[in-house]
Amino acid sequence: MTTYETTARAAVPGATASAPAAPLRTRTHTWEPRPASVPGLAEMSGLEILRAALEGTLPAASMTSTLGFRLTEVGEGRAVFEGDPGDHLLNPMGTVHGGFLATLLDSALGSAVMTRLPAGTTYTTVQLGVHMIRPVLADTPALRCEGTALHVGRTTATAEARVIGTHDGKLYAHATTTCAVLRLT
């Protein structure tokens, strides 16, 4: 859960009557921490883990609360996230920072790979290639990011993902990844 609060700003250096300083904003969020050792987690496949997170029986990754996105769909070789841009994600030019899109893409890519991993294995991203197509503004409605696993082998995996505007159907960014597949035991 994320909440926003706007408060009046005291005198700010550089603010003038014709260009007053904007009010300060505060953003807070809460998340359920995932215990370091979840009983039975090592016996679950990647798809089972993601389905449990989607259903709420396992906590979602804390990164999703931090940046304002969520897992919305998961299936064999596929994961979908939706993210909400906002003015808390702006870069110095006033558009949403590319790191938001890169993180959204990396989450969908890795989760798509994870859906194809058996129990006792995990993955880590070793390469991420992101292509930004158009800028995202603070008032851009939700973005949908769908990741698809292309290859999942014993030691490596690859996937691709796209970020599409839910309001306009336009492509905002796309990416590919290579992941290392790791045995936990």
PLM features per residue range, with description:
Residues 1-185:
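Terminal targeting signals and extreme-terminal segments of soluble enzymes
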